[in-house]
């Protein structure tokens, strides 16, 4: 596993196949997340079952999102569509699910279709802000 720091403030890229992650690999990913606030994994292919298994390595799976569409076979996976027919409903800085009594400790975003330009998702290190 190779971990590459992206900026001094936050972010690391990890070269690993998330579809076949081991407990030991998951611990290394968790440690990188704690050190760098956000981690990125390029060129991934995961089934919904692998996605939820990956999430389970990091703690209890959260309940389905109350507003957005959920995966038909695995309701704990939220399905977001952003295209001409489904424009994003927010363009503001936010943290996922902060309205809950116990917000989730992390989110896993698995982008399956990414535009050539635009469509950026940005992160900020609030500890350094």
Language-model features: locations:
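Non-heme Fe(II) oxygenase catalytic core, chiefly the N-lobe of the double-stranded beta-helix
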Residues: 2-129
